[in-house]
Amino acid sequence: MKKFIVLIYGIIAYLVFLISFLYAMAFVGNFLVPKTINSATESTGISAVIINLLLLSLFAIQHSIMARPAFKAWWIKIIGKPAERSTYILLSSLALLLLFWKWQPINTVVWEIDNSLFVWIIIGVAALGWLIVLLST
């Protein structure tokens, strides 16, 4: 019974990951979702920058701490080895979904590429990055 519960937990964790992964692609790619990284309609100012930095920091800190061997060893004692990876995936995905939900788009161009060759290079590098993230799970 315990193995079955851990299996269901793992499936749920990976479904949440899949949702956050697909949403991340749309959020960063500026398509298909109601709020994207670039969807500001008015100037939002320094408060948006601070909120966004805090959201990014929360994700980065959670993601980095839980990946450390010392934390994993401690965490496995609490939840068990079979559920460790699923918990890491679930909490990282939830932190990312929180980032999307609370993100404050900024109505300022941070960078822009006009050369079509460089645009395609950036798109290719981005696609490779998404593929690496997907395959690393």
Report the location of each language-model feature:
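Membrane-anchoring alpha-helices and their flanking helix-loop junctions
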Residues: 1-137
